[in-house]
Every structure is written in C-alpha cells, then in structure tokens.
C-alpha cells in the first residue's frame, strides 16, 4: 500500500514538473518575438542625425502590465518615416499587452516619463 501511494505521489510530481516546463517554454518564444520586434524598431529608427533640437522626437513604446509605456524610442523626424515607426511601435505595444495578459505578468507600475531630447553633436539623444 505504501509503495502504491509513493508511486502516485511520484507520478503526480513528474506530471507537475512536466506541465510547469511547458508553460515556461512558451513565454520564452513569445519574449524572443517581442525582443525581435524591438530590435527591428531600433534598427528602423537608428539614423538619429539632426541639425537642430526640433528634429528630435520621442515615441512611447511597449506596455507595462499595470499600464503606461515600458520605454521610449528617440528618433530624428527628418530621418525616420514617423507613420511607419508608429505602426511598428503599435504592433510591439499591442503584442506586449497581449503577453502581459496571456502570462499574467506584473510590473513595477512606476510612471515612465518621456526623456528630454536634444540634438547633441548632430545626433538626437536624451539630455
């Protein structure tokens, strides 16, 4: 009888671990996709050359689990197609919101202010 109970406990433990591993693999694939989208956005807006401060902009990007953006991207208006950038950022933000819900994620809930940007040495950067 004791051996039978031990076998059942062991089987339950193995099933629990197997199910837990499956759940941890899925977020990794989704997180890799999110990271790739972020890299594509950074690449799209990488030319930050500017001639004056008015050319430098920021755009909220991503979504914290409790609301608000998870980051900001700095870009040069004269070097970046703002409409295409906004579409890419929306795709990234919507996907991150989806993952927050899907995996029941939490975040720090701190408000992230947009960085103050300027044209420093001919490149848009945060002050």
For the regions a protein language model found, what residue spans apply to each?
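Short flanking/linker segments adjacent to small metal-binding domains or redox-active Cys/His motifs
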Residues: 99-127
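Mature extracytoplasmic domains of secretory-pathway proteins
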Residues: 57-94
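Short, charged low-complexity linear segments at domain edges
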Residues: 24-43, 97
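C-terminal motif of bacterial Sec signal peptides marking the signal peptidase cleavage site
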Residues: 15-18
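Sec-dependent signal peptide recognition
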Residues: 3-11
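Post-signal-peptide N-terminal segment of Sec-exported extracytoplasmic proteins
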Residues: 37-71
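Bacterial signal peptide processing site
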Residues: 20-22
């Amino acid at each position: 009888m004791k051996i039978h109970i031990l076998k059942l406990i062991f089987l339950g433990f193995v099933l629990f671990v197997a199910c837990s591993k499956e759940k941890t693999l899925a977020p990794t694939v989704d997180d890799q996709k999110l990271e790739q989208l972020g890299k594509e956005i950074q690449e799209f807006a990488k030319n930050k050359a500017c001639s004056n401060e008015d050319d430098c902009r920021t755009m909220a990007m991503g979504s914290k689990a409790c609301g608000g953006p998870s980051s900001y991207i700095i870009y040069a208006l004269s070097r970046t197609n703002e409409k295409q950038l906004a579409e890419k950022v929306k795709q990234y933000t919507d996907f991150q919101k989806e993952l927050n819900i899907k995996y029941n994620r939490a975040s720090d809930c701190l408000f992230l202010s947009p960085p103050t940007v300027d044209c420093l040495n001919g490149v848009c950067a945060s002050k």
